Regions:
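Cap/lid segment of the alpha/beta-hydrolase catalytic domain
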Residues: 44, 77-83, 88-213, 217-218, ...
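Hydrophobic beta-strand positions in blades of beta-propellers and related beta-sheet-rich domains
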Residues: 28-30, 72-76, 84
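Conserved hydrolase catalytic core segment
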Residues: 226-237, 243
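Conserved beta-propeller blade repeats
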Residues: 2-19, 46-64, 103-104, 150-154
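Multi-bladed beta-propeller domains
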Residues: 1-6, 10, 33-51, 80-99
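Long, ordered, helix-rich scaffold segments
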Residues: 18-19, 34, 39-40, 53, ...
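Beta-strand C-termini and the immediately following turn/loop, strongest in propeller blades
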Residues: 10, 17-24, 32, 62-69, ...
Length: 247
């Protein structure tokens, strides 16, 4: 019914709730049971909904929300009245969401495929080729790398750095085809996507190779190791964690 990746389906009193991933941001679609007419839950920011809590005899449900510059929040939504209520906001000492920004861009990989990437930093910061850049990647096993708040990223941004997270092929962000395009004989696509992310950031004056550190864990550790070996002049430092380096 929908071209976007379906994450979850829930039932409430008068509606079915479809949770989709639309260009690496959550989308809640409400299907009215009697007519199957659909409506969208309105939300101003791009981020991720999770932990949906529903009851079949109520039109009210709860969910958590986060993105790269928004610590976890819990909301109540009334599907019948189309009203949203804030229940709880996580307090992170020293962090003020309005002082930071996160935006999504699309950049071309080596074969021309457009790859989404989130770039986050302080709003009032002057960004140029001397800005420290932390580039994180995974790209495998049908795992979607979704926008979420991280104290590690906050610390990096607070010290004046840029955080960039591309959604590489091999993940589940766009469904099974996206996954298959980054596995087995197509694994090189993932390394190319990661290198192209660095090239885009350098070309657009977010940083330079000597100021760029790449990070990844497990499959992301393999990604970091392989990409650095193939394109060593793109990076100043690497942080591979528990990567399978003999593949």
């Amino acid at each position: 019914e929908n071209e976007h990746a379906l994450i979850d389906v829930r039932e409430i009193k008068d509606f079915l709730i479809g949770q989709y991933l639309n260009n690496v941001s959550s989308e809640i679609v409400l299907f009215e049971k009697k007519t199957l007419s659909k409506s969208y839950m309105k939300f101003n920011d791009e981020g991720i909904f999770s932990s949906l809590s529903t009851e079949v005899d109520s039109n009210i449900f709860y969910f958590s929300y986060t993105n790269y510059v928004t610590p976890n929040q819990i909301y109540q939504y009334n599907a019948l009245a189309n009203t949203l209520k804030t229940i709880w906001i996580k307090n992170v000492p020293g962090f003020e969401s309005e002082q930071y920004l996160s935006k999504k861009v699309f950049y071309p990989s080596k074969d021309g495929t457009l790859i989404p990437m989130f770039i986050s930093h302080k709003k009032d910061q002057t960004i140029n080729s001397n800005t420290p850049l932390l580039l994180y990647g995974y790209g495998g096993f049908d795992i979607s790398i979704l926008p979420s708040f991280s104290e590690r990223y906050f610390a990096w941004m607070k010290m004046g750095g840029v955080v960039a997270v591309p959604n590489l092929r091999g993940g589940g962000e766009y469904g099974e085809l996206w996954h298959q395009q980054g596995m087995l004989d197509n694994k090189q696509n993932v390394f190319d996507d990661f290198a192209a992310a660095a090239e885009y950031l350098h070309k657009n004056n977010y940083s330079q190779p000597t100021k760029t550190v790449i990070s990844g864990r497990s499959n992301g550790g393999l990604l970091v190791g392989a990409t650095f070996l193939q394109r060593p002049t793109l990076f100043g430092a690497t942080l591979p964690a528990v990567g399978v380096m003999d593949m």
